[in-house]
Amino acid sequence: MQSNMQLEPNFWQTKSLLEMTESEWEALCDGCGKCCYRKYIQGRSKRQKLYYTRIACNLLDVETGKCGNYSERFNIETDCTKLTKKNLPDFHWLPDTCAYRLLYEGKTLPEWHPLISGSPHSVKNADILIKNGIHERDVIDWFEFIIDEDHTFK
């Protein structure tokens, strides 16, 4: 997440996702860390179900929702996913609260989003962070940590 100091005010309302600079794109991230929690897919084709877990990437600080080594994450965690302007349509599993997903779907940012609230603490204060996260290295059975199921997975 970038500082708002160098960004145009309300850029997300005046620019499309494709028109945004790299700094603007990064600033859209609210820092909830939900994309860094593991997902589990069960079934095939129309019977596929996506399960969200409270199992976090080993780099994620589960208290703050921030990556412990953001600049090197792709080198350290081989399955770390890079969300870009071009591959965003493939990320239908992003949480309903994700700014990238919201803007892609033509929706507005929530009041607690740091770009709206002006506070980097608003995500935590709004109770958006996943509670009782556990690192992947500490997990044996993923099924014990399922927290939600998305029935709309395609």
UniProtKB/Swiss-Prot annotation:
It holds the Pfam family CxxCxxCC. Belongs to the UPF0260 family. NCBIfam families: PRK05170.1-2, PRK05170.1-5. This is UPF0260 protein NTHI1811. It comes from Haemophilus influenzae (strain 86-028NP).
